[in-house]
């Protein structure tokens, strides 16, 4: 049995062809080389597999032969099992000038022939996410540096050494191809995949913020002894309200109004009232309580329609609607009651400058509130440093949002959504990158989704999300049909930096 068993059959074109063999040796997503008689070697990928028996009808769904017919065929010397042939549909990965030549032989590729398809960078500049499935034969021909990099847990929970090509994500290319989406239904391996991505960022000491609403992203307990590295000095877990908060005197008037808006949408009249007051006086109060007293005093002067020693009525009566100001005060009072101003964010900023990953935990409500400040503050700090180069140093950062639809949902009108959208569009210029994980891809704001250059697609079955995948990725119709049936941990990776979709499996995580 050799590679000459595979030949191109039937009608072909420049996009796809069919290959026939008497031996069932190919699987979905395997890579093959068509040795085109006139155009040379053409790289292809298996997208469909079919089995045909020459003794049976092949053009109807209910084709079969009876036991009696089989016995008659055997009696005259026919072997039914030898009548089976295998047909494979191949999608062309190269760009041939002409249709593939019928009758061409087909063989399996070697590593050097296919390396460009998988890898855009070196191992030291890449994240080791998992393995590229169905590449065992190619793995045998790859250099030693690509071998024994990780372990894999199969669908039966058994751990294996690496036997297929490693999937490497070149994170240095995120300047050109920014932002990552990780999507999958419940039990698909989406959260596990997110854990592995964060582990890899920690290995490379990439400063990272993780908003963790499920309080599960802790990296202390090892999966296997002597597997992976010790992350204990590479991350910190901080809780909003206990370890993290907002230092009120550090806020400018734009940051403060964004925080107030988290407690309820502000009308134009409310914004005008706030801006009129802050246009006359910047935030000079030393605390949130002092600022509340300041607003309350102005409101009382406007309600009483008379001046006192402050002169607030004369200064603001023509500029500020008292009802709008009172609405702002009610929202600010609710903000004050969250205790968000009892701590500072200094621990966050210092950890990021040290190249650490910061896991931020809390209720979804508190995470949304704190994210509206922290995400904006980190982005502005990095932007000021890049633009001015004289500002205080602030590093390149990744911002990870688990359950991202709760931070930037398409049906939300929130400060956090607005900031995330801005980073999605402008962040790459400043070295600020997003990683959004969600069970509901279709629920995320569409402009943000469109800016994700790499998408990890785990098992998904809801029609709305499948439709979003059709629109926002380059998965083929065959791959989308397979999505509801993927095993836990199997994933399609749609990656702009290599211009291809790969079928992969997430590696065994170093931690639990």
Which residues does each predicted region cover?
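Basic- and hydrophobic-enriched, low-structure N-terminal and domain-boundary segments
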Residues: 1-183, 193, 197, 393
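Conserved nucleotide-binding/hydrolysis micro-motifs of P-loop NTPases
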Residues: 51, 94-96, 214-218, 243-244, ...
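Glycine-rich phosphate-binding loop of nucleotide-binding enzymes
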Residues: 139-239, 446, 480, 493
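Conserved catalytic network of the ASCE P-loop NTPase/AAA+ motor domain
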Residues: 174-175, 200-204, 351-352, 388-393, ...
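Hydrophobic "anchor" residues on beta-strands that sit immediately upstream
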Residues: 208, 398-399, 435
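P-loop NTPase motor domains
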Residues: 215-225, 244-422, 429, 486-497
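Conserved ATP-driven motor cores of ASCE-family P-loop NTPases powering translocation/secretion/packaging/pilus
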Residues: 423-504
């Amino acid at each position: 049995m050799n590679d000459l068993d595979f030949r191109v059959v039937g009608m072909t074109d420049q996009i796809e062809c069919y290959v026939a063999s008497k031996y069932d040796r190919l699987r979905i997503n395997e890579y093959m080389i068509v040795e085109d008689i006139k155009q040379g070697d053409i790289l292809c990928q298996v997208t469909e597999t079919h089995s045909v028996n020459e003794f049976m009808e092949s053009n109807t769904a209910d084709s079969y032969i009876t036991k009696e017919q089989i016995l008659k065929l055997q009696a005259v010397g026919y072997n039914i099992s030898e009548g089976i042939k295998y047909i494979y549909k191949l999608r062309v990965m190269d760009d041939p000038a002409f249709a593939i030549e019928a009758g061409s032989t087909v063989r399996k590729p070697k590593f050097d022939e296919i390396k460009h398809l998988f890898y855009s960078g070196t191992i030291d500049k890449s994240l080791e996410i998992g393995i590229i499935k169905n590449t065992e034969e190619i793995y045998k021909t790859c250099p030693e540096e690509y071998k024994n990099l990780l372990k894999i847990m199969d669908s039966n929970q058994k751990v294996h050494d690496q036997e297929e090509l490693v999937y490497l994500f070149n994170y240095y290319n995120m300047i050109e191809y920014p932002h990552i989406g990780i999507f999958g239904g419940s039990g698909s391996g989406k959260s596990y995949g997110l854990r592995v991505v964060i582990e890899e960022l920690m290995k490379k000491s990439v400063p990272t913020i993780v908003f963790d609403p499920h309080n599960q992203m802790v990296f202390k307990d090892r999966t296997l002894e002597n597997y992976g590295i010790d992350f204990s000095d590479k991350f910190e877990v901080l809780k909003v309200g206990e370890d993290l908060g907002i230092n009120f005197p550090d806020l400018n008037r734009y940051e403060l109004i964004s925080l107030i808006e988290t407690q309820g949408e502000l009308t134009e009249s409310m914004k005008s009232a706030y801006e009129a007051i802050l246009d006359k006086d910047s935030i000079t109060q030393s605390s949130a309580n002092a600022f509340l007293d300041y607003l309350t005093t102005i409101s009382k002067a406007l309600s009483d329609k008379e001046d006192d020693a402050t002169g607030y009525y004369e200064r603001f009566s023509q500029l500020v609607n008292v009802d709008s100001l009172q609405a702002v005060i009610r929202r600010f009072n609710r903000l004050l009651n969250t205790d968000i101003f009892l701590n500072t964010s200094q621990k966050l900023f210092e950890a990021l400058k040290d190249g650490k990953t910061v896991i931020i935990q809390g209720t979804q409500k508190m995470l949304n509130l704190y994210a509206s400040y922290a995400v904006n503050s980190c982005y502005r700090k990095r932007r000021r440093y890049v633009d001015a180069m004289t500002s205080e140093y602030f590093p390149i950062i990744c911002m990870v949002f688990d359950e991202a639809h709760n931070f930037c949902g398409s049906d939300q009108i929130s400060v956090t959504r607005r900031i995330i959208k801005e980073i999605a569009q402008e962040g790459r210029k400043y070295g600020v990158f997003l990683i959004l994980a969600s069970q509901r891809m279709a629920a995320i704001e569409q402009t943000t989704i469109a800016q994700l250059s790499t998408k990890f697609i785990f098992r998904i079955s809801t029609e709305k999300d499948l439709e979003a995948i059709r629109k926002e990725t380059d998965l083929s119709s065959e791959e989308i049909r397979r999505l509801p049936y993927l095993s836990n941990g199997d994933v399609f990776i749609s990656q702009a930096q290599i211009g291809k979709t790969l079928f992969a499996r997430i590696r065994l995580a170093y931690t639990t």
